[in-house]
Amino acid sequence: MPRRKDIRKVLVIGSGPIIIGQAAEFDYAGTQACKALREEGVSVVLVNSNPATIMTDLDIADQVYIEPLAWDSVAEIIARERPDGLLPTLGGQTGLNIAVELSEKGVLQDYGVELLGTPLESIKKAENRELFKNLMLEIGEPVPRSTIAGSVEECLAFAGEIGYPVIVRPAYTLGGTGGGIACREQELVEIAGRGLKMSMIGQVLLEQSVAGWKEIEYEVMRDGADNCITVCNMENVDPVGIHTGDSIVVAPSQTLSDKEYQLLRSAALRIIRALKVEGGCNVQFALDLNSMAYYVIEVNPRVSRSSALASKATGYPIAKVAAKIAVGLTLDEIKNPVTGKTYACFEPALDYVVVKIPRWPFDKFGSADRTLGTQMKATGEVMAIDRTFEGALMKAVRSLEIGVDGLHLPGSAGWSEMELEEKLSYPNDLRLFAIAEAFNRSWGMREVAQLTTIDYFYLSKIRGIVELERELQAAGPRPPRELLRRAKSCGLPDSLIGRLTGLPAREVHALRKEYGILPAFKIVDTCAAEFEAVTPYYYSTYDDEDEVAVSGRPKVLVLGSGPIRIGQGIEFDYCSVHSVWGLQQEGIEAVIINNNPETVSTDFDTADKLYFEPLTLEDVLNVIEKEKPLGVIVQFGGQTAINLTAGLAALGVNILGTPVEGIDAAEDRDKFEKLLTGLGIPQSEGRSAVNVEEAQAVAEKLGYPVLVRPSYVLGGRAMEIISSKTELVKYMTEAVQVSPRHPVLVDKYIRGKEVEVDAIGDGNDLFIPGIMEHIERAGVHSGDSIAVYPPQTLSREEIDKIVEYTLKIGRALKINGLINIQYVVDNGGVYVLEVNPRASRTVPVLSKVTGVPMVQAATRAMLGRSLAELGYRPGLGPVGGFIAVKAPVFSFEKLGLVEISLGPEMKSTGEVMGIDRSFPGALYKAMRAAGLKVASGGRVVFSVADRDKAEAVSIAGEYAALGYTLHATPGTARALEKAGLEVEVVEITDPVPLIRSGTVGLIINTPTRGKVPGRPGFLLRRTAAEYRVPCLTSLDTARALAMVLRSVRWGGEPAPVSMAELFEKEGTANCCLRKKDSKAAIF
């Protein structure tokens, strides 16, 4: 069928901020789809609230709206833009839910907007648990015994009938949100109560547990002519009972017989046909280990995390094909861009193995419940490709960046037999390492299989790696050639082989070269080499034949940022992609290394060459030796890439941008202090300490409170405000591993206004596109603060000082590329808090709101362009006539036992932006986009520490004036009553009944005695997170929210506005567009 000519304009809904369960895969999918639609001559209108995405760049769609993802906001955009069609299936669960609401509210019908891709009825049948169950039974597909419940009482009745355990699955939710496995009545009451609240329609599916069965996924495609194909089948190493986003996944499946494979493939195709999905669809099955019995667990009628993995695993561009199907094309009409010859109706074939391992945030949250179940907890994932399962597994493990290069965790040898058995029996993030430890202790295969319910195939492979390590240990410092080749084929890195044999890693490398054991690079081509591929997408393996053709063009290697984790998110992938575009603008061949299957940087057509590899010194050097680039760019890959700088430089690799000495001077505390003193720039007083005694001495001299943190970290990991000697000793002995090589920094804590600057340097001078002011005072991590552009409360003198200090620091460090500096402003004084000689998470926001393509400009500066050549003058850039507010987004409800109060260690998983002509309007949009829903009236509960009571009085007065009823804990209530406010006293010894009552609209709580689990304040905050009641732990945020509520009450809600409209009114339209052919992108 030819493309439909009646579809001229399409509205695409993005997925919003990165949260657990919905990450960068939707930026990749949305970007690919927007480009595909425009290739077909369709005008694209995009709405998304996430400024850190490539898809919200001005040249990805014809009109870009960075607005809250709520049905009424999208309805206003529909009224303005009048699209012919709406494509919601690229926006994750958020996009589907909005589409359903728009239809139910009559918006789509009123404006004649057609839902493209998957019909509304199909979405409802897949998402509504009862309709889905009925459809499966109609077509003869088996589903576990289940019931639909709208109350806790109904859940208890069903569980009483079929027995425990039971699985709770809320309708219309993401990443298993609110779900879980209940093994007893009390657990069911808690899980079902939470799940009902989190479901958009107040409905949960209660089903018999098939935990322990094998979990298999099929990614399938269907077009409007009912042509269907299977793109990829994937096998979860972990059994049913663990969310697939928290499972190790292998593609293609390794343990299915052909009969089982075909049985489930046929079922997947029957299901996509019955649902009438047009586009991509993910089907999940539970397969009995001992028979051919299976159940259908779930269907996602949209692009998903699994489809991103399937797409990167096979090279098949699922999102692109889905977008073209949505406008009428069929699979046999859509050319596969990977081969340039075959069509999308050809099923991909794989001649390699892909392994995905989730990246969990437990290194950030030591107190979190690490048990894995049906509710997802991972923030991101890594993917690895090799010719063997072992090779792919070991690559994936070292891609995680968790301080290990193999299957042995530091400290695992010290686990008792009982601890080890517990780690094997109860799924958790350490189970892979526990399996290796069990085999290391010569536990039997049968025993490990019974405890884990993991297939013998995978266990035998892990045991094989452990036995190989023993052979290497026995071989000594010169292992024989065949043993070394076997070790490299199984994915063991030189560093691990070196430790086992007693050789330094460089000597292992030299021995490999002597033996002729070198990696070969293979191409991902979707067709197992049946057709020649035209897209350069490679992986390494220890094989004789190499498939990479190295060009004679000048080339530069960009290091990506690896898996998404707290502190290092999608912002750095945005920067990596823009760096690639900057290189291409200059006619340089752009080569990128990354291992994250969710991102735009690992899409088949982003860079000139993509290497899907771990970001370790050995793996990066393999690519450098192959490609021989002019230099390597490390600035845009977050701490992942920065940490490789010294090792690469020591081996003679040319690091482009800021000199290594400049990076070291900024990161090394003592060197940096001397630099600032020499420049006459004040900073918060502090010292480094290499042991507990030194830290105590520094803290005593400075006076408490002090801010402590390790050096060379990102996202404020292990950073804390310490108020006493006892807290300091606890921190030094438990939170960090301090040593002369890894000192701890101890600073005097200044509680002023925090300000953030990003600047572009050419090695001599700096251009500052903009300054951002934080709403929360210093002490809250910049990634968790609400930030405003341009600053709203700084004086001219303070801004001038910030600009002066930034220029001085940049010149002294010879910044070439990007630099991020954080300041604290206190009583007119400006103090340097931190300097990062690299891209920061605010770069995408500033690029979008100033119109300055910061990363492209920085990349071109690294290639020798001066600021003048790029069209910039040193100093601060002009300020536009609108306000932008960046707000953090958290995923606390997914992580049990995690403290939600804000501090110097970053906790947010994503961010949103609000943009408007007024500050209250922009702040309202940002808060709404972040999911802060506060009723226009009702109860506000105050419970604040003694130090905050005086300030809380005025804030409580503002909420009272807005008509809210004040409630407070006894101590806080006394302070409010003393100020003449009417307040009702509440006790929070057990906060669950209060919050579960549904009468509390907002909680304002500041911690008193640290963050101790079990204390009433901690329980109040945790319960609020789990029941989605807004809980603010910063009085600055509470005051800002009161201002927003007042503004909306008197002035109404601000209207949506497109980015192009804002820039046109400023006379700067299109100044941040990407153009490959000229300098017009910058002038």
Curated annotation (Swiss-Prot):
Superkingdom field: Bacteria
Chain sites annotated for binding Mg(2+) 2: 298, 300
Chain residues that bind Mn(2+) 1: 284, 298
Listed SMART domains: CPSase_L_D3 (SM01096), MGS (SM00851)
Binding site for Mg(2+) 1: 284, 298
Allosteric domain, as annotated region: 932-1083
UniProt catalytic activity: hydrogencarbonate + L-glutamine + 2 ATP + H2O = carbamoyl phosphate + L-glutamate + 2 ADP + phosphate + 2 H(+)
Quaternary structure annotation from Swiss-Prot or TrEMBL: Composed of two chains; the small (or glutamine) chain promotes the hydrolysis of glutamine to ammonia, which is used by the large (or ammonia) chain to synthesize carbamoyl phosphate. Tetramer of heterodimers (alpha,beta)4.
Protein's name according to its UniProt entry: Carbamoyl phosphate synthase large chain
Designated gene of the protein: carB
